[in-house]
Design a protein with these regions (language model features):
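Thiol/disulfide oxidoreductase modules built on the thioredoxin-like
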Residues: 1-3, 7-50, 184
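Non-globular targeting/processing and membrane-anchoring segments
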Residues: 45-209
Length: 209
């Protein structure tokens, strides 16, 4: 990135806007007036056009570079919703088979039937405000509909994956929280991913593409 990135670790900006969504876009003009608000993915061409309009309004003599020409890759098919794993956003989670036990190690049991777009936990997990931490025989089963499945994780260890009950792949996890690709496909498909975590791995957030 060749431009400044603002970090909001303490959620000061998030809370100042009483925001409940991610991603959320707030376009603000040169006078500090909020001119546009949008939630969720997509419609990036319209966003860019609005940004260019506000920049020109602020400085009509400034010559802007040509508009970007990037292929539109936002899925148009039905896609599983993003799901946070910590207890802070448990009300917005798509966990089935029981609720999280906050700030303690608890044993979970995955139901045999998981609706599309939902996930279930089994084994022992510690549930924190932003993440869940694998303790023993820790598994997440997620029934997805998407081209791609991603999970934000941290720690050092591995995830062993199954796809529709068959061995799929192993993902090595290392270091600070970042996005890992669990599944990718050219077309939108549904499937059941089984994710077995080694002890100490932390999982934060499922996203889909």
């Amino acid at each position: 990135m060749k431009y400044p990135i603002a970090v909001d670790n303490n959620l000061a900006t998030w809370n100042a806007y009483t925001n409940d969504y991610w991603p959320a876009e707030y376009l603000i003009d040169a006078q500090g007036v909020i001119r546009h608000v949008a939630y969720g993915e997509g419609d990036y061409g319209a966003d860019e056009s609005l940004i260019r309009t506000l920049l020109t309004a602020a400085n009509p003599t400034e010559k802007l570079p040509p508009p970007t020409n990037v292929a539109y890759r936002t899925p148009t098919q039905e896609t599983s919703p993003e799901s946070y794993l910590g207890y802070t956003y448990a009300s917005e989670s798509y966990l089935v088979g029981g609720s999280l036990s906050d700030n303690v190690v608890a044993t979970y049991q995955s139901p045999s039937n998981i609706p599309v777009g939902n996930f279930a936990m089994s084994g022992q997990w510690y549930a924190g405000p932003q993440e869940i931490t694998a303790v023993s025989k820790s598994v997440i089963n997620i029934n997805f509909q998407a081209n791609d499945v991603y999970l934000v994780m941290s720690g050092d260890g591995t995830i062993t994956e199954t796809l529709n009950g068959k061995p799929y792949k192993t993902v090595a996890v290392s270091g600070y929280p970042r996005l890992y690709t669990l599944f990718t496909n050219k077309n939108d498909v549904s499937g059941l991913l089984g994710l077995s975590f080694t002890k100490g791995l932390e999982a934060y957030d499922f996203t889909f593409g």
